Amino acid sequence: MNIYIAAPFGNYIKPKQSNVIPVIGTYTLERRRGLLWKLLTTLRYDFKEQCWYNSLGLRNPGLAHGIDKITHGEVLSVAAIKPTDYDRLNAQIPLDIPIELNISCPNINHFKDYLKGIGQFQPRNPIL
């Protein structure tokens, strides 16, 4: 059984066990400055819901940086900002890079059909 360490923790925790896999990212097609004013509250634990929240606005240096940074045994987390991004993400990410599709970002609420286009991705091992 594999255990995945979700981003952002996967960016920093690099275990030596072969079945523990870091997920790095999340990356978007273009660089995003994110919501810097949320830096203090971006990673917080909600005791009532018993879960962690991460809402920094997908701040990242862009997909090309993520592709260059990823190493064997890691999963690349990516997110679309608009529906047409899925085709471009699929075209730019090499097939030998496993991916996680971040569809849970609370800051992506400006297009209704957020899941439209996910089926465009070619088979990979794994798609999370």
Give the residues covered by each predicted segment.
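N-terminal capping/small domains of soluble enzymes
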Residues: 1-74, 79-80
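Acidic-enriched, low-complexity/disordered segments with a strong bias for Aspartate over Glutamate
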Residues: 46, 68, 85-87, 96, ...
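Intrinsic-disorder/low-complexity coil detector
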Residues: 7, 21, 93, 97, ...
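Active-site groove signature of glycoside hydrolases
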Residues: 96-105
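Acidic (Asp/Glu)-rich catalytic clusters
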Residues: 16, 67-73, 89-96, 118-122
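Short, glycine/charged-enriched secondary-structure capping and boundary segments
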Residues: 18, 36-38, 91, 113-116
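Active-site-adjacent beta->alpha loops and helix N-cap segments on the catalytic face
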Residues: 33, 63-64, 82-87, 105-125
